[in-house]
Every structure is written in C-alpha cells, then in structure tokens.
A protein has these predicted regions:
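Bacterial N-terminal signal peptides
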Residues: 2-12
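Transmembrane beta-barrel domains of Gram-negative outer membranes and organellar outer membranes
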Residues: 20-315
C-alpha cells in the first residue's frame, strides 16, 4: 500500500528554474563581393532552411517566458488572481482550508480510500506553511488475514518561498517533510522523509491558461530501521484553464520514479473539473487513470477524488 502514500505528499511547493529571455535575431555578415575566392571554394553553399538554422534557440524561445503586450499582461494578472481565489495555482501565497476524499483502485484485489485535511497558512506575501493530515483505509482481498485497515497516516508539512513572481511567470521553492504518525504500519512509510519541491506557473496567452510544472524528490532520513527506505522522484505537468464565470479545468500527467525499486516508474493521467460556489468556497471532482507501471509506487488502475476548499488572503 505504499503507493497510496505518495498522494499524501505535496507534489510541488510550487517548472523551469529561471527565466529565459527570447534570443535576439542575429544578423548575418554580408560577404564582400571584391574578395577573391579560391576555385576550390567557389561553389555556392546550399542555403540553410530557417527550421534547421537554430532549432535549439527556437525551443528555448517557446518554453521560456515570452514577451507580452500590455493587454496580455493585464489578462495574465487577472487570471493569476482568479487561480489564487480558486486554489488552482500552486505558486500563489494564499490561505486554504481543504477537505478531500479519494478512492484508488490499486490492483484487481486491492483498493484504498484516502481522506485529507489540508491547511495552508500564508505569511508576508511570499511564504507559505502547509500541513496535511491524512486518514487512510486499505483493503486487500489477497491477504484476508490483514483485513481492512484504517486510521491516521503520515503527517506532512511543507514550507515554501515564492522566489520569483510576475503576472506571466512565477516560481515557488519549498521543502516537504513527513513524519511516521500512522496508527498502523500498513498505513504509513514508518520513516521520516524530507526533500525539495519546486512549482512554476507560466501564462499561455493564446490559450488564456497556465502551464504548471511540479517537481519533487523525497527520501527517508530516519525512522523504523526494519521498514523499507524511501527514495522517489515525481514530475507533474498540467494545464489550468478557466471557463465562463466560475468554472475551471485541469488536465495533468504525473510521472513517478521509485529509486528503491531500481528506478522503476509509473504514470497516471488526471482531469479535474471545478466550480467556485460562492465567495471563496469551491468544489471539484478529479478522475484519473493509470497509464503504465501499476505495480510501482504512485500508480493505480483508476481513481476518483472529490474536494471542497475555502481560500483566504495572506496575513
């Protein structure tokens, strides 16, 4: 059941590590017509197509922060405020009280239900403290002697700092720690874990959406020596869009690598649809499906999550 525990850990305090400015177009130096050219070099060279000239430079132009018009910057700032109000921007420094419940179909014989209370406390507009209190129930039909186990899982704390913030691009850096507070051995790692987390959000003017990246590494640093060590890396890529007056959607893929299992990996795809109900109250539903690697950490056959949240401003 260790795969279930990955959903307890915040997968991004906040995915590019810095801002890449668009490259200026280079001017080619014209050849001197009076310069003598040896006969062996007099054959004209084949022209280089624009698509082959500077492919790497064009890639960086597309993935890095782009220059925007004043109207686009104004729209980016407006949508950043909307995303913060709805609780969908992982780089926003806003308060949160959130309740979620998730059902995971892990294998043909095992499933789990995870309920989490999350509280975010913002400080001085650039700092955030997050606390997650999870409750887990697991069932494994192939191990009837264990039966169904339920209770408190591992408590998680995240401390984060927003290192960069503009209307079109933001970067959050944090550290995530978990503590072996599980009421039953099967409900937690049995280890203290710690690791860095990074979150970025970039405005996409053409889509009027945000491209969000989350990266996290987690490793065990102590705890029960008889329990298996923890060492995994996760990457999340998502597109956050807004519709009509109060609706939002998120399409995301999550890739996990478990280094304690020789680097085996898994991937899931999830879709979230949510609505702002009234004021700063919102609700969402998020189904997901496993793509590959169902027998490794962080994987499932399918899942569905529902949640409600209340967002509040910084202190």
């Amino acid at each position: 059941m260790l795969g279930v525990l990955l959903v307890l850990i915040w997968s991004g305090s906040g995915s590019a590590l810095g801002q890449i400015n668009p490259d200026e177009s280079s001017e080619e130096t014209p050849s001197n017509p009076t310069e003598e050219i040896p006969a062996s070099e007099s054959e004209p060279e084949e022209p280089v197509s624009p698509s082959e000239k500077e492919p790497k430079r064009r890639v960086f132009k597309r993935i890095g922060p782009q220059p925007m018009t004043p109207e686009q910057r104004e729209e980016a700032e407006r949508l950043r405020k909307v995303a913060a109000k709805y609780g969908t921007d992982p780089t926003a420094i806003v308060g949160r009280v959130q309740l979620t419940s998730q059902y995971l179909d892990l294998t043909p014989h095992a499933n789990a239900t995870l309920s989490t209370v999350r509280v975010d406390l913002p400080f001085r507009s650039d700092y955030l403290l997050r606390m997650d209190v999870p409750f887990l129930r697991t069932t494994d039909a192939q191990n009837p002697g264990m039966g169904s186990q339920r209770g408190l899982s591992d408590f998680a704390v995240t401390a984060a700092w927003r290192a960069y913030n503009t209307p079109e691009y933001a970067l959050l850096i944090g550290a995530v720690s978990t503590f072996p507070t599980a009421s039953e051995p099967a409900l937690g790692f049995g280890k203290y874990t710690v690791g860095p987390a990074i979150a970025t959000a970039r405005f996409l003017p053409r889509l009027e959406s945000f491209l969000i990246g989350l990266l996290q590494y987690q490793t065990s640093v102590g705890g029960d020596p008889s329990r298996k060590d923890v060492s995994f890396f996760s990457v999340t890529a998502q597109v956050n869009s807004f519709w009509a007056q109060r609706w939002w959607t998120i399409v995301q893929s999550v890739w996990h690598v478990d280094f304690e299992r020789s680097g085996k990996s898994s991937m899931v795809m999830e879709f979230e649809g949510g609505r702002n109900l009234i004021g700063r109250f919102g609700a969402y539903i998020r189904p997901g499906v496993g793509i590959y690697g169902r027998d490794v950490t962080g994987a499932y056959i399918w899942n569905i999550e529902v949640g409600v949240r209340y967002m509040f401003t910084s202190f």
